[in-house]
Amino acid sequence: MKIGIVCYPTYGGSGVVATELGKVLLQKGHEVHFISYQQPVRLTRFSQMVYFHEVLVSEYPLFEYPPFELALTGKMIEVAKDYHLDLLHVHYAIPHASAALMAKNILAQEGISFPYITTLHGTDITIVGRDPEFEPVITYSINQSDGVTAVSEYLRNETYKHFRVKSHIEVIPNFICLQEVEATQPDKELKNKIAPDGEPIITHISNFRKVKRIEDIIFIFQKIRDRMPAKLLMIGDGPERQKAMQLVKNLSLINDVHFIGKIRETYPLLKISRLFLLTSEYESFGLSSAIKLLQEKDLWEKFHQNSINQSRKFDSFEIVKLYEAMYEKVLSQV
């Protein structure tokens, strides 16, 4: 199949998942076309079967804000016609779904079938999408999609709860490349540099938005640090980073907390971490459990092994099969 993938090129979850999906589809013999305003950060290798098409937005004095959605629609149409795409897969509803719908309708006037699938990732539904000015457009764009997926049962339920969506939403979870994870070996030199006295390393990765409750990460680490030596790695960037850095200074944790910034490959740091800590509004990890896992090696090992066993259910090659089945289903109906 010739598949167009539209995503944000950033370090956020939707962009990473979309890029990794395209890379696996490429390995399985499909032709993949990425469409975005920048090259996706996780798209580092190119071949004859993978393409990147940049959306260029012209700036005119008349427009206070550049018309990105129109430029995106035009690029979708251009790529669909020039490369004879079979379908388009848009990740994150705003504004990709409405742009895809416009492109589909314009191409239909020329006798070209251009089905699109919308994947809902999170804040496009739970936060941003609930804005009264966005909701009618998002609802209509989702309902007009030829296929709709959500990355979790929770997100599907939230979509039905807050939007007038009539379309069937299929849950296809996020995935990880187990082969790549298992191939990454712990870097002892890196670990010793971060934790020279063998302190357990705690890691957080996010886009540092308010919903991630970044300050709570710091306060939790302070409680852990009061009981035992530890190091905290804060990976990523976003609007809450400066506030978190100031909090670290105020709590005198500056020698134990490292703000790494944006990095392409997180596996090496995760491999040397004892705990991955999340405190987002819709995700949580109990402080008492965190401390106990850090202190009791046998319990941590059991937790670790159970996590590995569970993660095998989300291997990229298995999950991508679900997307392929969705593509084939959509194409059979147009």
Spans of model-derived segments:
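Nucleotide-activated donor-binding/catalytic signature segment of Leloir-type glycosyltransferases, i.e.
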Residues: 245-261
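N-terminal strand-loop element at the rim of the active site
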Residues: 7-11, 23-68, 169
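A short, well-ordered alpha-helix in the C-terminal region of glycosyltransferases
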Residues: 299-313, 325
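Aromatic "clamp/platform" in nucleotide-sugar-dependent glycosyltransferases that forms part
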Residues: 262, 281
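A short helix/loop element that forms part of the nucleotide-sugar donor recognition site in Leloir-type
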Residues: 181-196
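Carbohydrate-associated surface elements
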Residues: 154, 175
